[in-house]
Amino acid sequence: MAKRTLGLAKAAKAKKQKKEQVHQESSDEESSSENQLTIELPEEIDANDEISQLKGLHKTYLESERDNELLVNGLIHECDRLLRENDTENKSPLPPVFHAIYATALAELSKFHTEELDKVKEYFTAALERVELGLQQNPNDITLLVTKTKILLDQISLQYIAPLTLESDTKELDREIDELLDATLSVYESVEARAKELNDYSIFDDFETLDILEALDDILDIVDNFGRKNQGDDDSDENDDDDEDEEEESVELSENHPLYKIKNSDKYDQWWRDHTHLYLDNLEKLENGSSELKREVCQRLGQSYLQESEVPYSVFTTLKYDDEYDGIEELEGLTEKQAQEISQELITKALDYLKRAKDEEDPETWVGIAEAMISLGNLYEVDSKQQDDLYVEAEKILKKANNVTNGKFKEELDNLLYKE
């Protein structure tokens, strides 16, 4: 599998922006109400059940922009209160979901203090201690295992990777980051194993669980782009010339750098692909699994195959059509024929998943299918039946999408008609 061809993090972040600097000093007028928080809980929450209320408060946070530190502190204070009350009144042990919410809230605090490494460490230490306490009382609880995986991935990003520079050395860390990542992925594998053991795959019918795979992809994307001048800068000048972009992408890490092993290994990209496939398999075992979630997983798989096809696709089109490469037999270790066959196989796989990701209410998903068809058509001989059939089908899809969106996809349609 080609190195870091699965980079879906940027697309995912466009849907779900993780804000790091959101807690700012309020004005004098606002400060008087800063310690007051009124939350309207979902209707289905039992007002007489304190754990149910805690779950409702947590759900409110999850469905928000997740930029309110006051709400996170509210969760923690409520957990502290329930814990004290439970200890005082000698009630039955608190359920696993309590420990999961408590640990998650503690870890979330780190995102509001990313410039204060000591606090980040403190929050993650407390979060992991809480989740381990929960697991001691509820061994192999699947919700707690999911929570632990998510916290560990966040810890890798914020505590271990965020402070690094190009000059960082593995000797500066108490643990090697690839070892931490291996241990974290092992916890997630225990989630999969536990679901299989219980024959209950409902844990996967939740975008919060799918976030684990997105968080891993985010980490791999950060590692792949580590050291680039505009890394993580969404406001960078889009008019930078291509030569400068190429120079930025060529940043090399020393063998002693904490991210060197991850950056120079294919295994984490392959792990992401394999376990995303397994995620989809587990979803399909549910009678009433979320259609939206299935489409999202299929979309990610389709995009991953498209991205993996980029290098062989470029090799094929260059060797076949670029006069400057006349007489050259190979590029990137591939002949024209090999590049063509590999690209056709990958884009065909991508099309299968993109079709399964199609949403009748979202023309963007239709256009994704059409664009993949055009790419596949480009890999066949000019004016061949295979190419013509793919172009004709893509044109139908683009015309339909263009009509229902009042011309939003006119450029894509015009480009295809120009090819024809």
From Swiss-Prot:
<comment type="similarity">
    <text>Belongs to the ETT1 family.</text>
</comment>
<keyword id="KW-0539">Nucleus</keyword>
<keyword id="KW-0804">Transcription</keyword>
<dbReference type="GO" id="GO:0006417">
    <property type="term" value="P:regulation of translation"/>
</dbReference>
<keyword id="KW-0810">Translation regulation</keyword>
<dbReference type="Pfam" id="PF12753">
    <property type="entry name" value="Nro1"/>
</dbReference>
<feature type="region of interest" description="Disordered">
    <location>
        <begin position="227"/>
        <end position="256"/>
    </location>
</feature>
<dbReference type="GO" id="GO:0005634">
    <property type="term" value="C:nucleus"/>
</dbReference>
<dbReference type="GO" id="GO:2000640">
    <property type="term" value="P:positive regulation of SREBP signaling pathway"/>
</dbReference>
<feature type="compositionally biased region" description="Acidic residues">
    <location>
        <begin position="233"/>
        <end position="252"/>
    </location>
</feature>
<comment type="function">
    <text>Required for correct translation termination and probably involved in regulation of hypoxic gene expression.</text>
</comment>
<keyword id="KW-0805">Transcription regulation</keyword>
<feature type="region of interest" description="Disordered">
    <location>
        <begin position="1"/>
        <end position="41"/>
    </location>
</feature>
<protein>
    <recommendedName>
        <fullName>Enhancer of translation termination 1</fullName>
    </recommendedName>
</protein>
<dbReference type="InterPro" id="IPR024318">
    <property type="entry name" value="Nro1/ETT1"/>
</dbReference>
